[in-house]
Regions:
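Cysteine/selenocysteine-centered motifs that mediate thiol-based redox chemistry or coordinate metal-sulfur cofactors
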Residues: 69-89
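A short acidic/small-residue loop/turn micro-motif
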Residues: 36-37, 47-54
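Mobile-element integrase/transposase regions
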Residues: 1-35, 41, 57-62, 66-69, ...
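RNase H-like polynucleotidyl transferase catalytic core
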Residues: 77-84, 98-117, 133-137
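Basic, flexible linker segments flanking DNA-binding modules
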Residues: 1-13, 111-112, 169-176, 186
Length: 210
């Protein structure tokens, strides 16, 4: 079940959704994002003037090109998880998904938490990016690019055992967590050693004073 069984590897399932921004003097712009469900890594994004099936396809093309899943032999192509918006239920997107040999899973109506990861990402991102006004689309794109870079490579996630999405996406998390465990064990051993020495040091000091 796509909703109750957690993914176990990168590129097993991608979550996608739109959110919106207002550019002063230009009107509304719509951000299409694709997030890897396992690592929370933002694989691709695109700032669009509409929320059409073609915009979804364009973002998917970027994600496929970035990951190379169409150029290597894989057990199965990533499944796409989305809501039931018009652009996601269109026959145009269905034909595209079939041509890419990808399965499309849509969330149950009135249960938006099935896309919880992408929705949380968009909320977090908008809390930062919307702190200022934008007067040109390229200004907004620039800030979005900065945020994605920070989110993927520098923002630690508690749900990922305090590593970054990039660490998980590129398979570095085991090495990082092992190194942390070694440092933790070494620190604890050093503390125990110092604690064992403390009473002896105090006793020697007392004798010297006498």
């Amino acid at each position: 079940n796509a909703f109750t069984n957690p993914t176990k590897q990168v590129n097993e399932m991608w979550q996608t959704d739109f959110t919106y921004f207002k550019v002063v003097g230009w009107g509304w712009y719509y951000l299409s994002s694709i997030l890897d469900d396992f690592s929370r890594f933002i694989i691709a994004w695109e700032l669009c003037t509409t929320m059409a099936a073609g915009d979804v396809q364009s973002t998917l093309n970027k994600a496929i090109a970035f990951t190379g899943v169409d150029r290597v032999k894989v057990k199965h192509r990533p499944r796409l998880l989305s809501d039931n918006g018009p652009c996601y239920v269109s026959s145009q997107l269905a034909e595209y998904m079939e041509s890419r040999e990808m399965k499309h899973v849509r969330g149950a109506p009135y249960h938006p938490m099935t896309q919880g990861k992408i929705e949380r990402y968009h909320r977090t991102m908008k809390n930062i990016v919307k702190l200022q006004h934008y007067y040109f689309p390229w200004e907004l794109e620039q800030e979005l690019s900065k945020f994605v870079e920070h989110y993927n490579h520098h923002r630690y996630h508690e749900s990922l055992k305090n590593v970054t999405p990039a660490d998980v996406f590129y398979g570095r998390q085991r090495k990082i967590l092992s190194a942390r465990d070694r440092i933790k064990r070494k620190t604890m051993e050093e503390r125990r050693r110092l604690n064992l020495r403390s009473p002896l040091i105090s006793k020697v000091d007392t004798i010297v004073q006498i």
